[in-house]
Amino acid sequence: RDPWRAPGARAPIPLARRALDGDRFRRATRECLMGVAAVDALLRESGIDRDIIRGRSTALLYVTAAAYGSSNQAFVVAEALRQARTTGAVSGGTYFPYTAPSTMAGEVAIEFELTGPYGILIGGATATIDALWQATRLIADGRCERALVLAVETFEECADLYSRGRWLVKRPLVEAAACVLLVPGARRV
């Protein structure tokens, strides 16, 4: 299947890698960079100012099936190389804290100054549906005024692991990031 045709009549929005200020993103994983880019693309394409989502009135729900497999793989490989060398240190590109799924929510929250409720759901498409439902509940219960639901999947760094279990995973493995903003109102939530 052609992943560019998957959305039907809607064209995918390419995630341009924007210049991120400062040293904070120097060691950020691709998952984090894709997550920040997806939220940025949502705001840009919708004409929404960052100030609208800033603060405690915006919830963030992060969803993934791959759940940081890529960053964990990069960390394990770098650590194995470091331990295999007896002289000098091998510096891996991934810090241990970046191997946790909570890193995505944290980096996005820091970048967009989100301090509202957040959650992490691991499990793919069904988890995404659950995240959308949870977002509507957070809004309906008055725990937030709006909710971002962010899904990010990366596979490149651990493609060999997926190829070994190829009977379990249908092709193609498509790396993607998507974000929606839910707000209250008729046909909006």
Segments and roles (model prediction):
Residues 1-117, 121, 129-130, 137-144, ...:
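Conserved "HGTGT" condensation-loop signature of ketosynthase/thiolase-family condensing enzymes
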